[in-house]
């Protein structure tokens, strides 16, 4: 049994802009989560081509420890709290698979994302079987809704309801910003349709952990996309060549930060 949910994140950026913004924000967010032996380690970041699909392949290890709930830390042996993330970014479609060497086929998080130039109105963009799709819970994430943010995650400088882009004039986002987008001819919009599959087979813990993982994914998607929009002026002028150079530098910085910096970033909400 697996737990399937689709998260829809609407943003006041274009699909093309998001490609750069996402990669910039992933690099920056990785630095915010790395230190004290924990965080992100980039093993591979290279172009790929397979079965007519072309894009960028990445393989990362997330060293978690304090970022998992206490009940898992108590049960899991040392080294079992590292997860491997393999991602195939054939933008505007991306596929990410997260596994754990200790749990092998009993643990899986799969995130499949379509980026579409709409306001989250398409049904079943991932073309699931009708019988499967009718059991998928759809969750809308509103990046400007503070009630969707945990108080310990809130930062005023990462609040789309307060941010005003100097370079683009976008923001701040009011309570009805999504409805207003339709009438704003000079402001692009898009939706990230993120289909998340979670499998965790551990007798007595399955439901608890699968629900915890979905809760954390929702938290990550919310915080990440709030940051992405509020960092708009930092990335909107960058090219993909700029991003690749930045990723190289970030890889070096992450290796250094993991060894020298204190633990930081999101911890498990026990």
Swiss-Prot record:
Primary location class: cytoplasm
Post-translational changes noted in the entry: Phosphorylated by PKC in a calcium and phosphatidylserine-dependent manner.
Signal peptide, first to last residue: none
Binding site for a 1,2-diacyl-sn-glycero-3-phospho-(1D-myo-inositol): 58, 60, 85, 89, 96, 194
Catalytic activity of the protein: a 1,2-diacyl-sn-glycero-3-phosphocholine(in) = a 1,2-diacyl-sn-glycero-3-phosphocholine(out); a 1,2-diacyl-sn-glycero-3-phospho-(1D-myo-inositol)(in) = a 1,2-diacyl-sn-glycero-3-phospho-(1D-myo-inositol)(out)
Disordered: annotated span: 250-270
GO molecular function: phosphatidylcholine binding; phosphatidylcholine transfer activity; phosphatidylinositol binding; phosphatidylinositol transfer activity
GO annotations of cellular component type: cytoplasm; nucleus
Compositionally biased spans, kind Basic and acidic residues: 250-263
Subcellular location(s) of the protein: Cytoplasm; Nucleus
Coiled-coil intervals: none
UniProt key word Acetylation: yes
Keyword annotations from UniProtKB, A to Z: Acetylation, Cytoplasm, Lipid transport, Lipid-binding, Nucleus, Transport
CDD domains (UniProt xref): SRPBCC_PITPNA-B_like
Residue list for modification N6-acetyllysine: 215
GO-annotated biological processes: axonogenesis
Family per similarity comment: Belongs to the PtdIns transfer protein family. PI transfer class I subfamily.
Function: Catalyzes the transfer of phosphatidylinositol (PI) and phosphatidylcholine (PC) between membranes. Shows a preference for PI and PC containing shorter saturated or monosaturated acyl chains at the sn-1 and sn-2 positions. Preference order for PC is C16:1 > C16:0 > C18:1 > C18:0 > C20:4 and for PI is C16:1 > C16:0 > C18:1 > C18:0 > C20:4 > C20:3.
Protein name per UniProt: Phosphatidylinositol transfer protein alpha isoform
Originating organism: Oryctolagus cuniculus
Gene: PITPNA
